[in-house]
């Protein structure tokens, strides 16, 4: 094997190149690769975090929708109950008003009956006096006539 000086020179140049590369080129490459892997890891973590937040947001939205539906149904049920209560109150008021009108009509009818009886008593008393006067063929004076009418009214 023939070793000559060019081989040693090539080895020295290679070692200088290796040292230069290790000293000046290799650290920025390692830093760039580390930064890149860190950015990728941060991006993946952010994506995972975003996905988790999205899932949480979906759950919150679903819960709020369910709550809104429940609230809506509750409000509808409350409105129906209030409407039914108002209808019952109106019905009760109408029945009370009808009973009051019937009672008033009965009272008016009773008053008319009493007035009619008084009028009939007066007429009957007057007819009785006239009949008695005609039977007795004598005239009764006005004061005696009024007293007789009052007595007959009281008796009837």
Curated annotation (Swiss-Prot):
Pfam families: ATP-synt_B
Record's keyword annotation contains Membrane: yes
Membrane topology of this protein: Single-pass membrane protein
Stretches that traverse the bilayer: 7-29
Annotated InterPro entries: ATP_synth_B-like_membr_sf, ATP_synth_b/b'su_bac/chlpt, ATP_synth_F0_bsu_bac, ATP_synthase_B_chain
GO cellular component terms given for this protein: plasma membrane; proton-transporting ATP synthase complex
Subcellular location: Cell inner membrane
Principal subcellular localisation of the protein: membrane
Gene Ontology MF terms: proton-transporting ATP synthase activity, rotational mechanism; proton-transporting ATPase activity, rotational mechanism
Keywords: ATP synthesis, Cell inner membrane, Cell membrane, CF(0), Hydrogen ion transport, Ion transport, Membrane, Transmembrane, Transmembrane helix, Transport
Repeat recorded as keyword: no
Record text on subunit structure and interactions: F-type ATPases have 2 components, F(1) - the catalytic core - and F(0) - the membrane proton channel. F(1) has five subunits: alpha(3), beta(3), gamma(1), delta(1), epsilon(1). F(0) has three main subunits: a(1), b(2) and c(10-14). The alpha and beta chains form an alternating ring which encloses part of the gamma chain. F(1) is attached to F(0) by a central stalk formed by the gamma and epsilon chains, while a peripheral stalk is formed by the delta and b chains.
Role according to the record: F(1)F(0) ATP synthase produces ATP from ADP in the presence of a proton or sodium gradient. F-type ATPases consist of two structural domains, F(1) containing the extramembraneous catalytic core and F(0) containing the membrane proton channel, linked together by a central stalk and a peripheral stalk. During catalysis, ATP synthesis in the catalytic domain of F(1) is coupled via a rotary mechanism of the central stalk subunits to proton translocation. Component of the F(0) channel, it forms part of the peripheral stalk, linking F(1) to F(0).
Family: Belongs to the ATPase B chain family.
Matches recorded under PANTHER family: ATP SYNTHASE SUBUNIT B, ATP SYNTHASE SUBUNIT B', CHLOROPLASTIC
Descriptive protein name: ATP synthase subunit b
């Amino acid at each position: 094997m023939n070793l000559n000086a060019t081989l040693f020179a090539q080895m020295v140049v290679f070692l200088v190149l290796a040292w230069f590369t290790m000293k000046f080129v290799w650290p920025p490459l390692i830093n760039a690769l580390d930064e890149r892997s860190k950015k990728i890891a941060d991006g993946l973590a952010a994506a995972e975090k975003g996905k988790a937040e999205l899932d949480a947001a979906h759950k919150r939205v679903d819960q709020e929708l369910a709550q809104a539906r429940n609230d809506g149904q509750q409000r509808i049920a409350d409105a129906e109950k209030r409407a039914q209560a108002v209808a019952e109150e109106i019905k009760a008021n109408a029945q009370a008003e009808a009973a009051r009108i019937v009672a008033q009509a009965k009272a008016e009818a009773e008053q008319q009956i009493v007035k009619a009886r008084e009028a009939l008593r007066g007429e009957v008393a007057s007819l009785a006096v006239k009949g008695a006067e005609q039977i007795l063929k004598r005239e009764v004076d006005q004061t005696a006539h009024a007293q007789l009418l009052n007595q007959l009214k009281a008796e009837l």
